[in-house]
């Protein structure tokens, strides 16, 4: 279900991130029903750390996820993120058949958040369907991937 750098836990899979972007305070997600991308500023690491100032960010998980026909997937924050006061927006459901390096949104309400680039930020959980889904995800975000390989 996950391929890449991860840590298996009793009830999920811990994952890090491969890319981080700052979402501007003014943004347009959909225009004329066609535009899907928001102009965002890519955040680079400072040495071995991401340093995120107060604001909202989109982060790409650092593993390729493949949701089987008999499951749905969720991506939740690790307790470390919660304890630091970082707010993760509610996750979108990863449908049966989704495959790719999904993204999540976090909000940094504190002055600054510093985290090692190899730290695991999220935990993926998979929930079994009552029966395998006959309809599999084939949407716009299928096979989304980082611009560069995750180490």
Regions found by a protein language model. Name each.
Residues 1-151:
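DUTPase catalytic domain/fold
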């Amino acid at each position: 279900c996950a391929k890449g750098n991860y840590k298996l836990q009793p009830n999920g899979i811990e994952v890090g991130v491969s890319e981080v972007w700052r979402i501007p305070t003014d943004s347009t997600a959909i225009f004329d029903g066609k535009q899907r991308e928001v102009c965002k500023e890519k955040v680079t690491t400072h040495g071995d750390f991401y340093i995120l100032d107060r604001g909202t960010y989109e982060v790409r998980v650092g593993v390729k996820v493949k949701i089987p026909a008999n499951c749905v997937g969720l991506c939740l924050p690790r307790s470390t993120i919660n304890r630091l006061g970082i707010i993760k927006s509610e996750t979108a459901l990863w449908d049966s058949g989704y495959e790719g390096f999904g993204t999540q949104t976090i909000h940094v309400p504190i002055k600054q958040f510093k985290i090692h680039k190899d730290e695991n930020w999220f935990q993926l959980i998979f929930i079994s369907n009552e029966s395998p889904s006959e309809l599999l995800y084939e949407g716009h975000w299928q096979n989304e991937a980082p611009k560069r390989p995750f180490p």
